[in-house]
A protein has these predicted regions:
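Glycine-centered small-residue hotspots that permit tight backbone geometry or close packing
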Residues: 42-44, 261, 281
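Conserved small/polar residues in nucleotide/adenosyl-binding loops
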Residues: 276-283
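A generic structural signal for short beta-strands and their flanking turns/coil linkers
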Residues: 76, 95, 246-251, 275
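Glycine-rich phosphate/diphosphate-binding loops that line cofactor/substrate pockets in enzymes
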Residues: 23-28
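Active-site-proximal beta-alpha core segment in soluble small-molecule metabolic enzymes
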Residues: 3, 7-10, 15-18, 30-197, ...
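Anionic-ligand-binding alpha/beta catalytic cores of soluble enzymes and soluble regulatory domains
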Residues: 172, 176-272
Length: 287
């Protein structure tokens, strides 16, 4: 069937790969886990993930459905960013999805679903540092980590948090202090500290949070950064070279000439103004 659509999105997969390369220049030697939740921010989770798998170390998703859709498409690690519904844990573990533990109840549910005949379940302990969306208080991390270590069916694969305001260094510093409390407590308990991750796109380029062992790159890899971020000096060049991977294109369906003072659109939201031209009217294209 002939495609008659008048507007479409074009996704530049090579631009995403280049942007990830720029992220690496900022965070190396830290590893890069690419966030592909919400259809890779609208860019298409499966085609994007296939294209970038050679240049990333892992993938991050938000829902178990996303994880299960992605699993047959890529061979690298897939990390959930939110707790898995307990009834879905057996399927998640069957497909080697890495699971966040945000409470003692989460750990108990994983232990109930874990099997002796499978590789150890890789879990990441989430630390509540101020985001307010759940997580272990720093003082509770040791108990949950010790329970994980004691279970041969489990592997402590990560310690993580998320800074909610990377544009505000004092707020981020306070969160990092709480994250460090958890890290120090593990060391004092002689529990090996697993790979740590806290930086998302904002933190990668502001330098407000350390790269630690790996970063979770989100919208930056698609060529977008929030306005007003106080960029770290050593990240400014890379930030300036990021390129949006998505283009919205459309075919014109009509052309018209609008005289000065004429309006366009519902409510006359645009008014022709001929201050900068000697023409008698503005050229308007409807797309």
């Amino acid at each position: 069937m002939t495609d008659h659509r008048g507007a479409w999105l074009e996704i530049d997969l090579e631009a995403i790969r280049r942007n990830i390369g720029l992220v690496r220049t900022v965070v190396r030697p830290a590893a890069v886990a690419q966030v592909v939740k919400a259809e890779a921010y609208g860019h298409g989770m499966v085609p994007v993930s296939r294209a970038i798998e050679p240049v990333v170390d892992a993938f991050c998703v938000a829902t178990i459905d996303e994880a299960l859709t992605l699993r047959p498409e890529v061979g690298k690690r897939i990390l959930m960013l939110y707790p898995v519904p307990h009834q879905a844990l057996p399927e998640a573990l069957e497909h080697d999805i890495e699971i966040p533990v945000m409470s003692a109840a989460d750990l108990e549910a994983i232990q109930a679903a874990a099997r002796d005949d499978r590789p150890p379940v890789r879990i990441h302990l989430g630390v509540e540092t101020g985001m307010g969306r759940g997580g272990l208080p720093p003082e509770n991390v040791v108990a949950v980590a010790a329970a994980t270590q004691a279970d041969p069916r489990l592997q402590l694969a990560g310690l993580w948090s998320h800074l909610h305001s990377p544009e505000d260094p004092p707020t981020s510093d306070g969160q990092l202090l709480r994250f460090d409390i958890a890290t120090t407590a593990l060391r004092e308990a002689r529990i090996p500290v697993p790979p740590r991750h806290a930086a998302a796109s904002g933190g990668i380029f502001t330098g407000d949070e350390p790269s630690l062992d790996f970063v979770r790159s989100g919208i930056a890899s698609y060529g977008v950064l929030d306005e007003g971020l106080p960029l770290a000096p050593d990240a400014q060049e890379a930030a300036a070279r990021l390129r949006p991977a998505m283009s919205l294109k459309a075919r014109p369906i009509a052309f018209s000439r609008v005289p000065e003072g004429g309006t366009v659109g519902y409510g006359g939201t645009w008014t022709a103004c001929l201050l900068y031209t000697s023409d008698a009217a503005d050229d308007v294209s409807t797309v």
